Amino acid sequence: MKKLIDLISEEVTKAFVEEGYDEKYGKATLSNRPDLCEYQCNGAMSAAKEYKCAPFMISDKIAARLSDNAMFSMVESVKPGFLNLKLNPEYLAGYLNDMQKEEGRFGCDKVANPKTIIIDYGGPNVAKPLHVGHLRSAVIGESVKRLGKYMGHNVIGDVHIGDWGLQMGLIITELKERKPELVYFDPDYEGEYPSEAPFTISELEEIYPTASGKSKENAAFKEAAMQATYELQQGRRGYKALLDHILNVSVTDLKRNYENLNVSFELWKGESDAQPYIPAMVQKMKDDGFAYISDGALVVDVKEDTDTKEIPPCMILKSDGASLYNTTDLATMVWRVQDYNPDMMIYLTDKRQELYFTQVFRCAKKTGIVREDVELKHIGFGTMNGKDGKPFKTRQGGVMRLEYLLDEINEEMLRKIKENQKEKDDLRMDEEEAEKTAKIIALSAVKYGDLSNQASKDYIFDIDRFTSFEGNTGPYILYTIVRIKSILAKYEARGNALPTPGTAILASGSESEKNLMLSLSKFNAAIENAFEETAPHKVCAYIYELSNALNAFYHGTKILTEEDPKKQQSYIALLMLTKGILETCIDLLGFSAPDRM
């Protein structure tokens, strides 16, 4: 189904062409003065230069040409040459009736040529709990993935676990000091290794920071950890068995935490999965003449003539022959191309890694790891800060675990729900329903609070504001959906059947009704735009506008007491379309709505 803005542009363009002007001047846009009109076209301003006449002379001709067009209720030429447009309510109602026939799609077509897209997001480290710094990658990545799937693409999410390097050696060395009798440390052991891990997740989460602290103060311990890392990378059986245990225990816990965020991954691959591909990749870079030795390290030049700042070479191996993140990320691309042949790869990390990804992407293209036509995209996000403007911390100043943050917001939402219940004697929730509802609303508060900000910008994580039922918040959006559910339930309780998707939505009879209809008509454009720009904040902006329009319509319209049955059915059909679109959008953002609040 064509976007409404495109249909309007087609009519305006036709008028420009019929008056002898170039079609490029007929593009319509949303009005930047909604008090004057709904859409506008400024093409006459640009056309005036080419046709050497006053812009208002052109806009007057276009307005006259469109004056009897059934699409518009108002076409106005305004000096110095603007074209102001208002849609005919009948035409707008017809567009919405076409939208509601496509249940679940609402006029948003899937792409004609689906792509295979891999999204690299999450990026947790094994043996470490998720902390608030992991929130943005998970939440933004999940939404981008859902948007891509909704548009019809084959989208694969890969968590890309940090499970390689010195951290593994540190854990192995600390474990060896504590439990030297374990068979994993016996180089002569040739039997089967135990299937049960020799540690729990809580023990593992304590082992790593202890070992990390020791390595900074004890040179011998650090040396032993580096040796253990080397032996692991060379394939020592016992250490590889320990790595498997570390991964299994960590991944089980990570999955639980991500599930609480309503985030899931198609692939649970790690840096260790890329290691087998490194030797052949490095050899090919050397053979093809791309990699050379510089200050002992193996590098590939990635600078380009058009660079306005210096782009250093991409380091492939350190002087001691050890691999780096660059090496692992490039080798990861090797297996992704081999296994999935993607058309696009999207990476979500802190925006401070922009230069790093410029180097890696250029190296991947230059050395032929990925085809030239594969799109490599880095979404760099800003920092989540506390009210003091500094990175979010616990009250004690430490890094806050993500599950503790979610618990804190769950408790705040539960408190608010119980407070609200005091005024609802006949409709009180029991404890179980209240807790379940609090979790649903809390997740909306966290996710919407993050996603409503442009990804690249830092933002203040304000629990009081994010958990408010008023303003641009997740709970406000959910409140709007629950309000619609409540009206529909009351309508049914009076013996009425909910209208089917084919029920006619009538032309608007009030300004608030038309504003709601105009907001609904923007759905397909909002979703397409949000995915094309990998910008979930645009979905948030859209549903905030739609929720405001719905609530204004609700306050200005006697929906349940309307005496004209056709008009009332039209109102209900309008509410059902709004509910469907809001529920689709929040699913794309990664949360859901309760039945009541």
Where are the language model's segments positioned?
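Short, charged, solvent-exposed linker or helix-capping segments at domain edges/interfaces
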Residues: 94-99
